[in-house]
Amino acid sequence: MITLKQALSLSQDELETLKNEIDAKVRASDLNAYIKAPSLNGASAKGVPILIKDNISVKGWEITCSSKILEGYVAPYHASAIENLHQNGMAGFGLSNMDEFAMGSTTESSCYGITKNPRDKNIVPGGSSGGSAAAVAGGLTVAALGSDTGGSIRQPASYCGCVGLKPTYGRVSRYGVIAYRSSFDQIRPITQNVEDASILFDAISGYDSKDSTSANLKPTHTFINLIRDKRFKIAILRDHINDASNEVQLAYENTIKALKEMGHEVVEKKMLDSHYQISIYYIISMAEASSNLARFDGVRYGRRAQNVKDLKELYLKSRSEGFGDEVKRRIMLGNFVLSSGYYDAYYLKAQQMRLMIKEQYNKIFEEVDLIFTPVAPTTAYLFNYHASPLEMYLSDIYTIGANLSGLPALSLPVAKDPLGLPIGMQFIAKAFDEQSLLDVSYALEQELDLKLD
């Protein structure tokens, strides 16, 4: 597939040809990366076609978060990120499959069915932005937008072998994203390479008065400022990788060696056990989810249950029929930790620990420029692999720290396991220092001669 950098130089006629080629590929593909053929909605404007995750509002498109409860909901406005695409020569073209309401790490919980990994169709593409990552890796789109709440960009990018960038919380407007976890949610790019990630990030970032969490900063210009030969002081967290597979640990050590050979200074640091971060993250995120999803009740928009006697039955039946099992599980757990008897014991304590994690990152960044860790403890696994939801939650063990702290992070494919499955590593940077993330990743990508094949 043509890269985003190349596509931006195409004429309007050439772009129409490209859209037709993408549409034909999607119709012929069995990956189920798209919810439906992109030509059925058409493009949101003229420009380079970008795949959009099904939780980002595009005016006139049915946006469902891959959930039955939002069947028939048509977005009445563009998300700010979509408007920014239009201003930078790009446009939405197609909606990607995802875990229902972004609650999952495998893209198995979508009401539209599973998405397959183009590297091996028997394994998961990751999630929740699995459709976006599978489409990029499978040559079905130039680039894609997803959302990263606890690793939902970086983990599927790692599993599928592409680049996933999570900007600093507040750098990209959340306006127009259907809320799951408001203190975590943000729109992010998934691309074929680091240059494209930089271009797409510059296009969608910027202050937005419609989003109260938007940082009032100048627009970014990371692409024109990409530098290959800059040297950084990088922290590694060896005590964090004990849960990783042998293949991931080997790739981690080999990449550390490559970074040293490139002239970067590598030092060891320690942090709070990542298992604690998992607990903290899920307590807070489930609490926020139960609050945000209370609005979906069958009254104003989306699925409305039929043959009900009263308002209470309408609520119960609409939500029971509309939500999938994983969403129901998280709503119930969220309501539990917010209940009067358990608020202090769980939710309040988790928020206090979240501040402690932020302080730990800040302390490390007083001495280093970047932190380097694996993205996931294993490569992608078979469908229906996890015996329990808890096992699935543990696949986020290395990614959630950046989300809890609101820090920028980038997933880069660095190796393959013996079965040929991609292995991704991530860099984490100081708040609003996406430039350093992109610089070091761009240089490493060139050093390892990484190509999306």
UniProtKB/Swiss-Prot annotation:
Q: Name one GO biological process term.
A: translation
Signal peptide: which range, if any? none
Q: Which reaction does it catalyse?
A: L-glutamyl-tRNA(Gln) + L-glutamine + ATP + H2O = L-glutaminyl-tRNA(Gln) + L-glutamate + ADP + phosphate + H(+)
GO MF annotations, alphabetized? ATP binding; glutaminyl-tRNA synthase (glutamine-hydrolyzing) activity
Task: Name the PANTHER family on file.
Answer: GLUTAMYL-TRNA(GLN) AMIDOTRANSFERASE SUBUNIT A, TRANSAMIDASE
Give the record's family classification: Belongs to the amidase family. GatA subfamily.
Q: What does this protein do?
A: Allows the formation of correctly charged Gln-tRNA(Gln) through the transamidation of misacylated Glu-tRNA(Gln) in organisms which lack glutaminyl-tRNA synthetase. The reaction takes place in the presence of glutamine and ATP through an activated gamma-phospho-Glu-tRNA(Gln).
What name goes with this protein? Answer: Glutamyl-tRNA(Gln) amidotransferase subunit A
- Record the organism: Helicobacter pylori (strain J99 / ATCC 700824) (Campylobacter pylori J99)
Q: Gene encoding this chain?
A: gatA
